[in-house]
Regions:
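Residue(s) in the substrate-gating loop at a strand-loop-helix junction
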Residues: 149
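The beta1-alpha1 cofactor-binding region of Rossmann-like NAD(H)/NADP(H)-dependent oxidoreductases
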Residues: 47-48, 68-80, 111
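Active-site loop immediately N-terminal to the catalytic Tyr-X3-Lys motif
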Residues: 107, 154-160
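Alpha-helical segment proximal to the catalytic Tyr-Lys
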Residues: 134, 178-179
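Conserved glycine-rich cofactor-binding loop
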Residues: 22-24
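Substrate-binding pocket helix/loop in short-chain dehydrogenase/reductase
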Residues: 105-106, 113-118
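Active-site helix of classical SDR
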Residues: 129, 165
Length: 195
């Protein structure tokens, strides 16, 4: 119990970015971090959801902000996160949560939809890492949590696009862990089941 208390005390006053923070798992993580005294910025595509979550976060006595963008748009990601970091400060914690899912047979799924899933679930986190992690390297400290899925551990019928994107995210995370650990940056992958 003492170890858990020490970890929680170490979170107080830190800054976190949660992508896909307007609903679901991202919202839950953002609120949990805020409850531990972490200042939390969130991103997503629905401004009304983001505004509502920011109000909930701020009600916990911490600072919060949001930015509306699509993680598949590299220019939006870099411009929005540069502005957020100028206003909010460099992030100590990155939760790469934004993602989408659609299911269908590999021969039936439309190529554009297949590509969109991979762009959102793999390129999106990559763009966010490229925008945020240099600040962690500069500070020689940080935590990156990439949200993958059990579908990234084992493929199944009708999950080719989703599984490919989540397998890729696990591989990216593992490589990042080896690359960044010398700068005191921890990289973790979570693999939840269906949410």
């Amino acid at each position: 119990m003492q170890l858990i208390n020490n970890i929680m005390q170490n979170l107080k006053g830190k800054t976190a970015l949660v992508t896909g923070g307007g609903r679901g798992l991202g919202k839950a993580v953002a609120l949990a971090l805020a409850a531990e005294g972490v200042n939390v910025a969130i991103t997503g595509r629905n401004e009304n959801n983001l505004k509502s979550v920011v109000a909930e976060i701020e009600s916990k006595g911490v600072k919060s902000s949001y930015s509306v963008f699509d993680v598949t748009d590299k220019k939006q990601v870099f411009a929005s996160l540069e502005k957020l970091q100028n206003d909010f400060g460099k992030f100590d914690i990155l939760i790469n949560n934004a993602g989408i899912a659609a299911f269908g047979g590999i021969l039936e799924m439309d190529e554009e939809q297949w590509e969109d899933i991979v762009k959102t679930n793999l390129f999106g986190p990559y763009y966010v890492v490229k925008a945020v992690v240099p600040g962690m390297v500069e500070k020689k400290s940080g935590d990156v949590v990439n949200i993958s899925s059990t579908a990234g551990l084992k493929g199944n019928a009708l999950t080719s696009a989703y599984s490919a994107s989540k397998f890729g995210l696990i591989g990216m995370s593992e490589s990042m862990m080896f690359e960044l650990r010398k700068q005191n940056i921890r990289v973790t992958t979570l693999t939840p089941s269906t949410i």
